[in-house]
Amino acid sequence: MALKMDLHIHSTYSDGRLKPVELVRKFHGEDYGIIAITDHDTVKGVAEAQIAGEALEMKVISGIELGTILEEKLKLHILGYYIDIENDRLEEVTEILKKAREKRNQALLEVLDKQGYTLTEAD
């Protein structure tokens, strides 16, 4: 029998709908043997997913999806696996990316508000 795996999963720490532990339970229930949590620009959910995975004897690979811009308008998403989620420099970089994303999101909300669409960041 082939080993089922999904190596590109987002949790509620980025744009996913399920918490890391919920993802582990969901994929375990669907007979996956390996998953990777690869949230956008953060590794905050990886440790809790790995703990849940250990309890269910399922491999959870540490991962991240980093957004970057190559040249002027070429946006890239780079997936990283087996990363050190406790690396201080990684934490610094992801915090910078988080602040930039929050600033961009606020600007988008302001544009939408001027067009008559009132939304909050939670929306």
Q: Could you describe each region identified by the protein language model?
A:
Residues 1-73:
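An N-terminally biased module of ancient metal coordination in phosphate/nucleic-acid-related enzymes
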Residues 54-123:
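Extended substrate/RNA-proximal surfaces in nucleic-acid metabolism proteins
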